[in-house]
Amino acid sequence: MISKINFVKMHGLGNDFVIVNKRDLSSSYDLSQLAKNMAERHTGIGCDQFIIYEEHNDFYEMIIYNIDGSSAKLCGNATRCLAKLIYLDTGKQDITVMVGNKKLLCNVNDENNISVNVGSVSFNEAWMPNRDKVWEFAERYMIDLKETICVDIGNPHVVIFSKLEPQDQKIVGERLQAKELFADGVNVNFAEVKDNKIYLSVWERGAGLTLACGSGACGSFAAGLKRGFIHSPSTIVFKHGNLTMKEENGNIIMQGAATLVARGEYYCEQ
């Protein structure tokens, strides 16, 4: 039996998503498998993450799946995309998005300028692996741990301010997913600071290297502030555009564009 699923394809600075309203899904779908199928770039629609959303009385619930079918706890770029989609469909400009118990306050200033208040971040390193293991790993790849910091923005990030070549970023990103280092994996940010800007590339847990990462931008901005490398406001630079970041009363606010690519129907065999 073949069923149709309405979907929207969007991206934030090249970080792309397939977005589906929960009302268009039957309860019989295996959502993890559906995410893997729709995310496949050759036989599906293709995306970095698969997003399901549902409208409630005063907020929208967002569920995030990685391309390997695992779940994610936060995605800043997907939040901006969802806020823009809701704005286009309803005209709402102030939108609250819930991901688990994380509340994200969004404002659509215009179609190309969406801000998301992601709240506060935590530098509690309770989820960090044994320091000896980290030192051994860092020495192997010539990473300066004095310029490396862990930050939890709703999902875990390691921010590395040492300069690594792209091929080394891939290796380090992959190998930091080892269970003996981070039991649940980790998002790895490679940050280079110039003139109060952070030039950023991110290895996302469950997705690999992506063209942009909103939660990585928030975590790296917070880490840069803590280390004194930058001041607020600042700019995060990705390959396909920038995000403006600022800190207000302990909250991190991200601002940038989101792009609608397509609306369509996906044919799903059940």
Curated annotation (Swiss-Prot):
<comment type="pathway">
    <text>Amino-acid biosynthesis; L-lysine biosynthesis via DAP pathway; DL-2,6-diaminopimelate from LL-2,6-diaminopimelate: step 1/1.</text>
</comment>
<dbReference type="GO" id="GO:0009089">
    <property type="term" value="P:lysine biosynthetic process via diaminopimelate"/>
</dbReference>
<keyword id="KW-0963">Cytoplasm</keyword>
<feature type="site" description="Could be important to modulate the pK values of the two catalytic cysteine residues">
    <location>
        <position position="204"/>
    </location>
</feature>
<keyword id="KW-0457">Lysine biosynthesis</keyword>
<feature type="binding site">
    <location>
        <begin position="204"/>
        <end position="205"/>
    </location>
    <ligand>
        <name>substrate</name>
    </ligand>
</feature>
<dbReference type="GO" id="GO:0005829">
    <property type="term" value="C:cytosol"/>
</dbReference>
<feature type="binding site">
    <location>
        <position position="155"/>
    </location>
    <ligand>
        <name>substrate</name>
    </ligand>
</feature>
<dbReference type="InterPro" id="IPR018510">
    <property type="entry name" value="DAP_epimerase_AS"/>
</dbReference>
<dbReference type="InterPro" id="IPR001653">
    <property type="entry name" value="DAP_epimerase_DapF"/>
</dbReference>
<comment type="subunit">
    <text>Homodimer.</text>
</comment>
<feature type="binding site">
    <location>
        <position position="15"/>
    </location>
    <ligand>
        <name>substrate</name>
    </ligand>
</feature>
<comment type="similarity">
    <text>Belongs to the diaminopimelate epimerase family.</text>
</comment>
<dbReference type="GO" id="GO:0008837">
    <property type="term" value="F:diaminopimelate epimerase activity"/>
</dbReference>
<feature type="binding site">
    <location>
        <begin position="214"/>
        <end position="215"/>
    </location>
    <ligand>
        <name>substrate</name>
    </ligand>
</feature>
<keyword id="KW-0028">Amino-acid biosynthesis</keyword>
<protein>
    <recommendedName>
        <fullName>Diaminopimelate epimerase</fullName>
        <ecNumber>5.1.1.7</ecNumber>
    </recommendedName>
</protein>
<feature type="binding site">
    <location>
        <begin position="76"/>
        <end position="77"/>
    </location>
    <ligand>
        <name>substrate</name>
    </ligand>
</feature>
<feature type="binding site">
    <location>
        <position position="187"/>
    </location>
    <ligand>
        <name>substrate</name>
    </ligand>
</feature>
<feature type="site" description="Could be important to modulate the pK values of the two catalytic cysteine residues">
    <location>
        <position position="157"/>
    </location>
</feature>
<feature type="active site" description="Proton acceptor">
    <location>
        <position position="213"/>
    </location>
</feature>
<feature type="active site" description="Proton donor">
    <location>
        <position position="75"/>
    </location>
</feature>
<comment type="function">
    <text>Catalyzes the stereoinversion of LL-2,6-diaminopimelate (L,L-DAP) to meso-diaminopimelate (meso-DAP), a precursor of L-lysine and an essential component of the bacterial peptidoglycan.</text>
</comment>
<feature type="binding site">
    <location>
        <position position="66"/>
    </location>
    <ligand>
        <name>substrate</name>
    </ligand>
</feature>
<dbReference type="Pfam" id="PF01678">
    <property type="entry name" value="DAP_epimerase"/>
</dbReference>
<feature type="binding site">
    <location>
        <position position="49"/>
    </location>
    <ligand>
        <name>substrate</name>
    </ligand>
</feature>
<keyword id="KW-0413">Isomerase</keyword>
